[in-house]
Amino acid sequence: MFRFSFSWIGTKPRALQGTKYHLLTDAAGLPLHVLASAANVHDSKLFEPLLETNPSVRGRRRRPGRPRRRPEKLHADKGYDYPRCRRYLHRRGIKVRIARRGIEAKTHLGRHRWVVERTISWVLRFKRLGIRYDRTAATLLPLLLLAVTLINFRRLRQVEEL
């Protein structure tokens, strides 16, 4: 049995198979949280759920008190350039660094975007996630979380050895 999800382009239905991974990373590229969605779901739909699950992160300087729950600023690509996403960030007090749709900015976002692209390539190195053998989210999400855990473990082990 095959499962298809349809989206409409003009008057013809197009079956879009596959999965998109939405990653929240720190500045070094360590994945903090990851979500998976169908390929035909728009990126901005998972913007708030991805940021709501942001774990507490202690900064480089050991300040007394609680660890931070929100970043100072957030870099995102054009898929998140919607007023709803911008309002959400303003309400939480996060500086908005989202690329504008229709405007080509070669130097600004690319300096930060490659970190996320590299992290996505680390996730896709796991064969079961890159090819997507699993049909249900119940089997995909644990594998995705395991991949993110292994990536963090390997990166932190490299830092510890230095």
Kindly label every feature range from the protein language model:
Residues G18, P83, R87, R92-V96, ...:
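Basic, amphipathic alpha-helical segments enriched in Lys/Arg and hydrophobic/aromatic residues
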